[in-house]
Swiss-Prot record:
Record-level GO cellular component terms: cytosol
An individual GO BP term: regulation of DNA-templated transcription
Subunit structure comment from the entry: Heterodimer of an alpha and a beta chain.
Record-linked NCBIfam families: himA, PRK00285.1
Protein name per the record: Integration host factor subunit alpha
Family per record: Belongs to the bacterial histone-like protein family.
Gene (name only): ihfA
Keywords: DNA recombination, DNA-binding, Transcription, Transcription regulation, Translation regulation
Organism: Jannaschia sp. (strain CCS1)
Database matches in Pfam families: Bac_DNA_binding
InterPro entries: Hist_DNA-bd, Histone-like_DNA-bd_CS, IHF-like_DNA-bd_dom_sf, IHF_alpha
Molecular function terms, GO-annotated: DNA binding; structural constituent of chromatin
Task performed by this protein: This protein is one of the two subunits of integration host factor, a specific DNA-binding protein that functions in genetic recombination as well as in transcriptional and translational control.
Length: 100
C-alpha cells in the first residue's frame, strides 16, 4: 500500500488534464459533483456510481452498549450513518490490483 491519499485537488487536476477545462472550472466541477452527492445523502437518497459503488445513509435505532473496560452499560442514541457498498467490478479491480 502506497499510503497516498486522493484529494479534491488531485481530482480537479485530473479533470484539468483529461477533460481540458481550466483549473478553476475543473475545481468548480469537482466541488459541484461532491456537493450534489452530499445533498442527496443528507436528504436520505442513495448515490449510485456505476462500476464504483453505492453510498447510502442508514438509520440506527437507540440501543444499550457496554463499556468494554468496565462492563458498564451505556445508552447509545439513535443516529444516521453513512455506508458505502462497492460494486462487484470495483471489488474485483481492487482484489486484482488493476488500474485500468
Amino acid at each position: 500500500m502506497s499510503g497516498k491519499t486522493l484529494t479534491r485537488m488531485d481530482l480537479s487536476e485530473a479533470v484539468f488534464r483529461e477533460v481540458g477545462l481550466s483549473r478553476n472550472e475543473s475545481s468548480e466541477l469537482v466541488e459541484r459533483v461532491l456537493q450534489l452527492m452530499s445533498d442527496a445523502l443528507v436528504d436520505g437518497e442513495q448515490v449510485k456510481v456505476s462500476s464504483f459503488g453505492t453510498f447510502s445513509v442508514r438509520s440506527k435505532t437507540a440501543r444499550v452498549g457496554r463499556n468494554p473496560k468496565t462492563g458498564e452499560e451505556v445508552p447509545i442514541s439513535p443516529r444516521r450513518v453513512l455506508t458505502f457498498r462497492p460494486s462487484h467490478l470495483m471489488k474485483d479491480r481492487v482484489a486484482a490490483g488493476n488500474r485500468s
